[in-house]
Every structure is written in C-alpha cells, then in structure tokens.
Curated annotation (Swiss-Prot):
Cofactors required: Mg(2+)
GO molecular function: magnesium ion binding; orotate phosphoribosyltransferase activity
PANTHER family on file: OROTATE PHOSPHORIBOSYLTRANSFERASE 1-RELATED
Role noted for this protein: Catalyzes the transfer of a ribosyl phosphate group from 5-phosphoribose 1-diphosphate to orotate, leading to the formation of orotidine monophosphate (OMP).
Family: Belongs to the purine/pyrimidine phosphoribosyltransferase family. PyrE subfamily.
Biological source species: Methylococcus capsulatus (strain ATCC 33009 / NCIMB 11132 / Bath)
Positions with a binding annotation for orotate: F34, F35, T128, R156
Lineage, uppermost ranks: Bacteria, Pseudomonadati, Pseudomonadota, Gammaproteobacteria, Methylococcales
A Pfam family that the UniProt record links to this protein: Pribosyltran
PROSITE patterns xref list: PUR_PYR_PR_TRANSFER
Keywords, alphabetical: Glycosyltransferase, Magnesium, Pyrimidine biosynthesis, Transferase
Gene: pyrE
Name assigned to this protein: Orotate phosphoribosyltransferase
Substrates-to-products reaction catalysed: orotidine 5'-phosphate + diphosphate = orotate + 5-phospho-alpha-D-ribose 1-diphosphate
Length: 213
C-alpha cells in the first residue's frame, strides 16, 4: 500500500465517509463497513478527494486527453480532479460532464465543458451495477472519442450473482480498465497495521465469503 492510499483511508475514516460496524447493503448482504461518498460534501473534503484522484492518476501513469464525470455524482468529482491535477502537477486536462436532460436553448445538447475527443477517462465514486459506466461509454463513443478507463474511489472487490465483482464485469464486458484509489484489500492491510483487531476480523470474514480473491 502506497503512502497516499493510507492517507486516503485516514481521511475517509476521519470524515466518516468510511465507517465500520454492521450495515445492510441494497443487495441484502450484511457488511462490516459502509462507504458513503455523499459525505464528500464540503469544499475541503471535495478538494482533498480531488487530490487523491490526481495522485492515483499520476502514480499509475494513467493518461487521458479529457476527464469525464457522469451526472450527477461525477460532476463535482471530475471538476475537483481536474483542479487538483493542475495545481499539484501542473497538468491541464480538460473536463466535461453530461446533463440528464437535453437543453434546447443556449449551447443546447446534453454535454457541458470540453469537447469529448481522443482518450477519455471516466471519473466516478464507486461501481455498483456498472450502469453509469455503460451510459458514459455510449456518450463518449457517440461523440467520436474513445473511453480509456474508469477512475473510482473504492473497489469493494466482492463478487456478485455472476461470480464476478462489479469492476471485473465492467472490465470484461466493456474492455476498459478500472483504477481505484483503494480496494478492499487496502482496508484490510490498514486495519492490520493499526491493530484494529475486531474490525479486521469482521472484514476478513466478509472477504472469505464474498471476496474476489
């Protein structure tokens, strides 16, 4: 685990985006942790999140001509990432996002921001069913550009009904890589390193039942 990944886990625990306990997921599973990206709801938190996205891009050597944020959750995420890249690395990557409803006046259409061209990286919080990613790919290809990957905050690394994780399904069916700031394995490494025995045992048990590895 890289230093920025440990710092990210410290950050999300500190602002209670990541909580440990007993939670019922939409799937009906009982999870020992919950990741609520809706709590990136202040300027300071959003700015810090953008820095972690930017660090993931630069440390992984991930290249893109345009960043794209799917409405609605992806809009502040893609803007924060573009700002952080410009401030931290001096790299100016244009960004765009879509509207849910087409606009029939002004510039019109469903796309806002930079033109979608070349290699386009999708920025989102998590992948649950992959619906948002599939819709984004249709939009990007429809504009004549090429989706080159997806950047998310957390990869849960747990299998669904298909026997694959949501991220694996996206990668296999759509043929594009998914990059995450951290994965479930990093949460386990973090808990092991910080001596949080009870939470560690709960997450290891969860991984033994639902984990991808």
């Amino acid at each position: 685990m890289q230093t920025y990944q440990k710092d990210f886990i410290d950050f999300v625990i500190g602002c209670e985006v990541l909580r440990f306990g007993e939670f019922t997921l939409k799937s009906g599973r009982q999870s020992p942790y919950f990741f609520n990206a809706g709590l990136f709801n202040t300027g300071a938190r959003l700015g810090r999140l953008g820095e972690f996205y930017a660090q993931t891009l630069t440390s992984g050597g991930i290249r893109a001509d345009v960043l794209y944020g799917p409405a609605y959750k992806g809009i502040p995420l893609v803007a924060a990432t573009a700002i952080a890249l410009a401030r931290v690395s001096g790299e100016e990557i244009p960004y765009a996002f879509n509207r849910k409803e087409a606009k029939d006046h002004g510039e019109g259409g469903t796309l806002v921001g930079a033109p979608l061209q070349g290699e386009v990286l999708i920025v989102d919080d998590v992948i649950t069913a992959g619906t948002s990613v599939r819709e984004s790919i249709e939009i990007i290809r429809g504009a004549g550009a090429r989706p080159c990957g997806v950047l998310i905050a957390l990869d849960r690394e747990e299998i669904g009904q298909s026997g694959k994780s949501a991220v694996e399904e996206v990668q296999d069916s759509l043929g594009i890589p998914v990059h995450a700031i951290v994965g479930f394995r990093h949460l386990i490494d973090y808990l092991r390193g910080s001596g949080r025995v009870r939470e560690l045992a709960a997450l290891e048990d969860y991984r033994s039942r639902y984990g991808t590895a």
